[in-house]
From Swiss-Prot:
The lineage of its organism: Eukaryota, Fungi, Dikarya, Ascomycota, Saccharomycotina. SUPFAM superfamilies: Protein kinase-like (PK-like). This is Altered inheritance of mitochondria protein 9, mitochondrial. Its main location: mitochondrion. The gene is AIM9. GO terms for cellular component: mitochondrion.
Amino acid sequence: MLSRVVRQRSRSAISSFKLRAHAAFAETRIGVGISVQATRLQSTKLSANPEEIYTKISDSADPKRNQFFQYTWGSWLENDKLKKSHRETRFSIEGVSNLVQELNLTRKDPANVDSSGEPLLQIKPVQQLKDGSFVLTNNLSNKLIGEAQDKDAKLLVKSIASIHEGKDLVLRIPYKLESDYSISQKIKSEVATLDFLSLKLGLNVPKVVAYGDNRSNALQTPFILMEYIEGDLLMKKWNPLAADSEETDASLKSVIQPISDFQDKILSVNFNKFGSLYFHDDVSVLDQADVPYDGEENPLLVNRWRIGPSIERQFAKNKNHLSEKIVKEFNGPWKADAPLSLITSVASIELENAKNRLGLAQADSASKVEDVEVLKKQIETFEHLQAIGSKLFNSKSKSIMNVEELFRPKLFVPDLDPLNVIESNDKSYFIDFEYSTIKPFILTSYPNFVAYHGAKVYNLEEDIPGFTEMDEVEKQQYEFMYYKTRNERLWELELNSRRHDLIAVASPHVKVLKSPYLQALELKTDKDYLYVEGAIVQLQAMWDAYVANELCGSSSSEFPVQYTEEFLDRHQTDLEEYQIETVSSPFAATGGWIPQDMFETLKEQGIIVETENGNYKVEAEKALEEEPEEK
């Protein structure tokens, strides 16, 4: 049987590129329907001249279908081919068809239908299919996977399309950026978290139909098959740099409020441990003994979820060279009375990772060229974070309002963002729960779309002397700072109106104390350790005051890290050089990644050129040339 492969021009916006470029999953829409004769594949390759390619559906080795599996959202200035190869998302097309058939058979199982033959949709334990996949039978509704009019008809794949053109289900496949262990844990936890949010809290999230946490399934890859939500991204309404007006205020709040509402609902549950959510059978026997939260009255939910190891990003990202055994030493779960263990655990795994990389580099066994001096400085920094981590906070401090509530285990979703919210039928659906974890609210960060770490400007004319006399370029710099301050403030006001008992997280002193930990969670390049060290250095000047006010977990005014003048001078020099390097290097903020349409345009213009070693560079002089005036 022949299938048509269509390469169609992508219609995504730049904001979509941002979402996909840094996600650890690729998404493909799967259309299901009554037995059909063809499967359509569509790539997301940006092309002004779409072309049709034919391939045999049973020929998994056909090179013509490669384009569909390849990463096409963007390109990198360095190691482009290698980074794209890590993001290929191959799966068995036949396997998808077989899985859908299995789902249909499972739905028709007498144990899963009522007397009229309709799906029961009752809450049942996760069921494993014969191919190794898992299915949530309570989500096998006709609405989600389609309905066969003839009871003997087969429910088969109708189409396989890109993220932009499908209709019914979304197939999520992880990029090969993390270890098999990390990917497995991440999938199991994300599915359980979605299940919890849907069944326990009744929130608007996609329903998971089936999943596989490893390659032992019909698709031959880890995957999540879930509900497709039709609608528009909330991001379309977000205009963060709009000038102040009643209309702007209403517009900004129309984006912030639904996200704040969602956070408020997930904060309603106090958990019994720190870690991440899993289904009961996916954690150790020891962890199965502890219920995740108290007071569950629904017998169908009492033993549905448990708390296991954390899948927070830092326990998986760039940890490929650490064995599963070593990772398990650091990723929890942790008891509720040991909240600062989360900080020391992050410091410890980063320290272990840096030592491991240094050892491989010195033995000439590293898989890439390493900067040995940078790795040595990383080790020093994470030793400092390890030393200060358990002393950053006093979890019983009387100087922090409602301190006990702030340190209770709460569910934290790191990707609460209008890019991950779909508006559909007057409802807001939240779609991304990767790396969700249970941690103290005081150790969480604000959503990226409102977070601002720069100097605060609350009133341009009062806070900035001579603002009205400045030229337009200088004014714009301060206006940017003002708008970012305003947006973060709006988020804090929404938090205060819903959870006044948690508003102490807005304290500047709390932000300074947790900054070393949050900086460690935001590592994107090897030199970002400089920001971690900088946050620790900043604490030194305030340490006496924090000890005196019992804010930190130390009774000694002696700073836990002993710095020499030589070290501080070297750190300041390294930090300034790195900041200059970042500012002067195009696309440094994205790690050299460029959206594909922009990449191709700049390449055509001669601004991006390929070098002899296969990398690319930006011709700064070419970029600064003025465009010729049109005649």
